[in-house]
Amino acid sequence: KVSATVNGKETTDITVEKTDSYEGVKLKVYNSGSDGDRVVLKVTWQIQHLLNLYSDIAVLNWFPISDWDKGFGQVDFTVDGLDASQGELYAHAGYFGKDPQVKRTSTGYQVHVDNLPASGKLELHAYWPMTSALRENNQAYLLNKTNKADFLKKEADIKKSKENFRRIFYVILPLVILSF
């Protein structure tokens, strides 16, 4: 479902083209606004079978935003569904951009990103402890191995890589250039 506001007023004068492909779902949204209008889109997805289920945790690894031809001034993303008090969500938007802000809510998580550039990506990476209800209702999808240690190691590696890239790009490279 897609809804829109233009300059703070709700509008139904939008056209949505949805294309399914092997890479995912592509939405194109057209509105009758004018140059300079502030357009806010709200896209609501009811998604099933998006989690990888392990014996100890359920894992979300999803790129809800990728391959855009225009940048976004601001993105707010909500993830609800499993008990947020028991899991952890990490959001990534590349090595050099401002880190997304993740806030735990009573029903899930709120992710906020400022200035996501054209062709930028937003990755959501989360885990929740496996529950007996989730296990019982999804036996066919359950992987018979643990994953929490690997998940946490991957997050630590991402954080370390980001710090290293930023150090090289913002500290070492400028020092090398200044030394010539």
Where are these regions (language model features)?
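N-terminal pre-first-transmembrane soluble regions of secretory-pathway and organelle membrane proteins
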Residues: K1-T19
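Core subunits and conserved enzymes of cellular information-processing
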Residues: Q101, S106-Y109, P117, V171-L175
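Hydrophobic, helix-length membrane anchors
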Residues: K148-F180
